[in-house]
């Protein structure tokens, strides 16, 4: 049975119980004990949770907090795009160079703009999220790392009845859908790891 260490934000925490149940025949899923909000937190988590455990697969579910505006009316982000790309590269290289684990990057899902209270309150927008995701995917491709495109999965399944109360986290049905889609890809990755 393969061992998977997964790090991610609250969105990841929401779908992980279902994901663990779906993978129970193929893999043991261990979720980091606290949500990992930014790429900086992922950097710390690699040393704290991935390297000591040496799982067959290390999954990094990117959170959208990196893309949050830090000042209302300005466009500066909590983690600037160039720093985000560097962090992703460092995270993936640490796993590739200091372990036998297969790293996997999961992109940030889009926000549901119908339910985000106000752009200035949350400071999230899908254009920026998409830009950060493309940067992470380019880094992963350069390093030969698998990507699970949660942004694309959610966009492709967009439905008018899909409700996220504050526009960021998913309801139970949305989390189940995400878990199912991610499980399919993780089974493929585990089979090769």
Where are these regions (language model features)?
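Catalytic nucleophile-elbow at a beta strand-turn-alpha helix junction centered on a G-D-S/GDSL motif
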Residues: 1-17, 35-38, 65-67
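A short, Lys/Arg-enriched amphipathic alpha-helix followed by its capping loop at the start of a domain
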Residues: 15-27
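Alpha-helical cap/lid subdomain in secreted, periplasmic
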Residues: 22-25, 41-193
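A short beta-strand-loop structural module common to alpha/beta enzyme folds
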Residues: 26-42
């Amino acid at each position: 049975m393969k061992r998977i260490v997964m790090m991610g934000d609250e969105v990841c925490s929401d779908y992980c119980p279902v994901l663990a149940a779906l993978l129970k025949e193929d893999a043991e899923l261990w979720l980091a004990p606290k949500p990992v909000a930014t790429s900086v937190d992922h950097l710390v988590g690699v040393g704290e949770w991935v390297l000591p455990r040496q799982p067959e697969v290390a999954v990094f579910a990117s959170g959208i907090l990196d893309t949050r505006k830090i000042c209302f009316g300005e466009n500066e982000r909590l983690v600037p795009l160039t720093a985000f790309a560097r962090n992703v590269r460092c995270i993936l290289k640490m796993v590739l160079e200091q372990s036998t684990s297969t790293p996997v990057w999961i992109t940030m899902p889009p926000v549901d703009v119908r339910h985000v209270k106000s752009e200035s309150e949350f400071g999230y927008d899908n254009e920026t999220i998409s830009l950060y995701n493309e940067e992470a995917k380019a880094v992963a491709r350069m390093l030969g790392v698998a990507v699970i495109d949660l942004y694309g999965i959610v966009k492709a399944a967009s439905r008018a009845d899909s409700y996220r109360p504050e526009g960021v986290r998913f309801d139970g049905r949305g989390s189940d859908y995400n878990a199912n889609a991610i499980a399919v890809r993780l089974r493929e990755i585990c089979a090769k790891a």
